[in-house]
UniProtKB/Swiss-Prot annotation:
UniProt xrefs under NCBIfam families: L29
Keyword entries, A-Z: Ribonucleoprotein, Ribosomal protein
PROSITE patterns found in the cross-reference section: RIBOSOMAL_L29
Gene: rpmC
MF annotations from Gene Ontology: structural constituent of ribosome
Protein name: Large ribosomal subunit protein uL29
Disulfide feature: none
GO CC, any one term: cytosolic large ribosomal subunit
Example GO biological process: translation
Family affiliation: Belongs to the universal ribosomal protein uL29 family.
Source species of the chain: Polaromonas sp. (strain JS666 / ATCC BAA-500)
Gene3D superfamilies: 1.10.287.310
């Protein structure tokens, strides 16, 4: 899980790749849960929240860049 301060230091491309990586990880966790291989189901929730956090910071970054132009 990455912290908000670490995410805010990344540029737009870095944030987009972070979101994609988190979504892939979340998909893998969902498949593990479906096949009953996942023992710690709280990782699903934390991954989902990390995705939301990264998307929020991505949107904020895009708005800031638009305001600077």
């Amino acid at each position: 899980m990455t912290k908000s301060t670490e995410l805010r230091q990344k540029d737009v491309a870095g944030l987009k790749t972070e979101v994609k990586e988190l979504q892939k990880a979340h998909f893998g966790l969902r498949m593990q849960k479906a096949t009953q291989q996942l023992t710690n189901t709280s990782t699903l929730r934390s991954t989902r929240r990390s995705i939301a956090r990264a998307k929020t910071i991505l949107a904020e970054t895009i708005v800031k860049q638009g305001a600077k132009k």
